[in-house]
Amino acid sequence: MKLGIDENYFELEENLLKEGYRFICGVDEAGRGPLAGPVFAAAVIMDREIIIEGVRDSKKLTPKKREKLFEEIVKESITYSVAMVDNKTIDEININNATFLAMKNAIEALELVPDIVLVDGYEIPDLNLPQKALIKGDRKSYSIACASILAKVSRDRFITQISSLYPVYKFEKHKGYGTKEHIRLILEYGPCEIHRKSFLKNILR
């Protein structure tokens, strides 16, 4: 069943299916840029018979719409997984390596081994699976767009949940991103244990 979505948005997956790939996995991250908290990644293999209406790049959706789509994607997926890498590891291995690690962990936690992985951005090093990297892939691939929503909602929920542990920073409002208010609070109170120290060098110097 296809529900009101541009056909070219699923064209990549359709072509891969014709080439014989059965389990097509979309992978995306959330939280590369924030000053605090973990980076998340999601991997998902969607049912090719069901296209969920309204799936797009998660950054272009309202939080309410993302939450609704999250539940639909979870329900209609063949298998999905979400992984995170914490701020301390980000500081140790850098954000690029941390993002790739989260992506690999998410893929490896799937209940099925993908035939091919579609990844937003750049190829994942040492993946040992066929993969295709797409710049701005969440705008070009339905599977990546679904993964984008899973990663974004999962991270937002996590940050909102732990915000009560650090109330002065108001993480529930900015989700760790470098807003003017967040930077002001860092300068006033100093960083807390979930801040990425490697991201604060220019702010705290």
UniProtKB/Swiss-Prot annotation:
Species name: Caldicellulosiruptor saccharolyticus (strain ATCC 43494 / DSM 8903 / Tp8T 6331)
GO molecular function: manganese ion binding; RNA binding; RNA-DNA hybrid ribonuclease activity
Keywords, in A-Z order: Cytoplasm, Endonuclease, Hydrolase, Manganese, Metal-binding, Nuclease
Name this polypeptide is given: Ribonuclease HII
Entry annotated with the keyword Cytoplasm: yes
Catalytic activity: Endonucleolytic cleavage to 5'-phosphomonoester
HAMAP family: RNase_HII_B
The RNase H type-2 domain, residue ranges: 22-205
Encoding gene per record: rnhB
Top-level taxon of origin: Bacteria
Entry note: cofactor: Manganese or magnesium. Binds 1 divalent metal ion per monomer in the absence of substrate. May bind a second metal ion after substrate binding.
Localization annotation: Cytoplasm
